[in-house]
């Protein structure tokens, strides 16, 4: 990647799109401090942050959440690796995300949508300021997608800075305020998600879907009224 420059405000939800190999994953991992081999500077509230600082301030939800579910119950998962978690916050989050009935269940016994909600619950409880979601609607049906969209908006209301790597046009229309389009390690487009920008957004997603290497074609659920 090179010549990447942007700013993000608290509460902003930013989509990250582009074909496979365009630089989306490298960018996301660099944001979270998981990619050490990068030049340039990162600032948070005016303070420069190295990769260790970014690790402390960020949380990444992987495309396959099974790789980050380690505990033997949903409740334990929500406190795994978190210092001094507040039980009242855990209880309230499980209730809000409709996970309370499953608090004693093993995460591997849950549906795909429920597992995503567990990952979102952890992101709410851990107290991190920067959240990155990698294809959070991959494999989800329409109802589960809308639930995840609502949870993302809830995190935005909490003042989190959120980046979402996605190919899901309608999910973007329901959650994001702007789109970063990556191509060959560069970021040529930074587009607001508005009705005026709809033709550009359609073109960018068409480019993303038509490039070689796309292993799955998802028919867009986009409705212009959602923008």
Locations of the language-model features?
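Conserved ABC ATPase signature
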Residues: 106-110, 114
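Catalytic Walker B motif of ABC-type/P-loop ATPase nucleotide-binding domains
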Residues: 131-134
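Helix-to-loop junction immediately C-terminal to a conserved catalytic motif
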Residues: 32
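Conserved beta-strand-loop-alpha-helix hinge in the C-terminal portion
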Residues: 186-209
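Conserved ABC ATPase "signature" region
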Residues: 87-102
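Conserved ABC transporter NBD signature motif
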Residues: 40-54
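H-loop/switch region of ABC-family ATPase nucleotide-binding domains
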Residues: 166-167
């Amino acid at each position: 990647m090179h010549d990447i420059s942007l700013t993000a405000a608290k509460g902003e939800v930013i989509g990250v799109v582009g074909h496979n190999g365009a630089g989306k994953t490298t960018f996301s991992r660099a944001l979270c401090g998981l990619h050490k081999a990068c030049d340039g500077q990162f600032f948070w509230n005016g303070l420069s942050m190295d990769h260790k600082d970014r690790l402390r301030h960020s949380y990444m939800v992987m495309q396959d959440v099974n790789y980050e579910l380690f505990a033997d119950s949903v409740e334990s998962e929500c406190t795994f690796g978190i210092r001094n978690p507040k039980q009242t916050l855990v209880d309230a989050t499980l209730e809000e995300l409709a996970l309370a009935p499953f608090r004693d269940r093993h995460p591997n016994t849950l549906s795909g949508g429920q597992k995503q909600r567990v990952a979102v619950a952890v992101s709410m409880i851990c107290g991190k300021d920067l959240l990155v979601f990698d294809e959070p609607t991959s494999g989800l049906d329409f109802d589960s997608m809308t639930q995840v969209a609502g949870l993302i908006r809830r995190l935005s209301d909490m003042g989190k800075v959120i980046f979402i790597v996605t190919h899901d046009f309608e999910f973007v229309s329901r959650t994001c305020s702007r789109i970063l389009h990556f191509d060959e390690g560069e970021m040529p487009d930074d587009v607001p998600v508005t009705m005026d920008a709809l033709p550009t957004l359609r073109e960018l997603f068409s480019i993303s879907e038509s490039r070689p290497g796309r292993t799955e074609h998802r028919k867009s659920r986009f409705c212009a009224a959602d923008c």
